[in-house]
């Protein structure tokens, strides 16, 4: 499928290098699975072209209202071209979105015999590698 336009409906700067962004595709929310990622494309002024980068979806698949991303701006050795532009966008601005892709993050909550599996789950991730785990935690909370 081709890229689709999406509007920014929410931004929150958590730290000088960490932002939460929520996007709504203009054509409606596609189906996706918790743990997937998609590409965000923006015109990069310095290069006079659209540049796309992959970002993990931090919202869970049961959320049909928006995509949420937690994005860190790494400036060394060189700042990311798309990430840098994302930090300067505002509510109402538009970006291009690719289709959700990648494997989903599934942890079964039942044994094969149907009995509930009440063991604790430990997820390890660093930096913005936490985004899929945020999605999983929301999914787990809302489905159990």
Annotate each PLM feature.
Residues 2-93:
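Ferredoxin-reductase
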């Amino acid at each position: 499928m081709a890229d689709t336009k999406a509007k920014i409906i929410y931004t929150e700067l958590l730290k000088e290098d960490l932002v939460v962004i929520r996007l709504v595709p203009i054509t409606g929310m596609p189906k996706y699975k918790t743990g997937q990622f998609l590409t965000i494309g923006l015109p990069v002024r310095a290069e006079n072209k659209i540049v796309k980068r992959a970002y993990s979806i931090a919202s869970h698949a049961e959320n049909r209202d928006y995509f949420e991303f937690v994005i860190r701006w790494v400036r060394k050795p060189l700042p990311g071209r798309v990430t840098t532009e994302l930090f300067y966008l505002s509510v109402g601005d538009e970006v291009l979105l690719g289709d959700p892709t990648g494997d989903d993050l599934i942890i079964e909550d039942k044994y094969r015999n149907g009995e509930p599996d009440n063991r604790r789950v430990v997820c390890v991730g660093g930096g913005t590698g936490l985004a899929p785990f945020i999605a999983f935690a929301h999914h787990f909370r809302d489905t159990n």
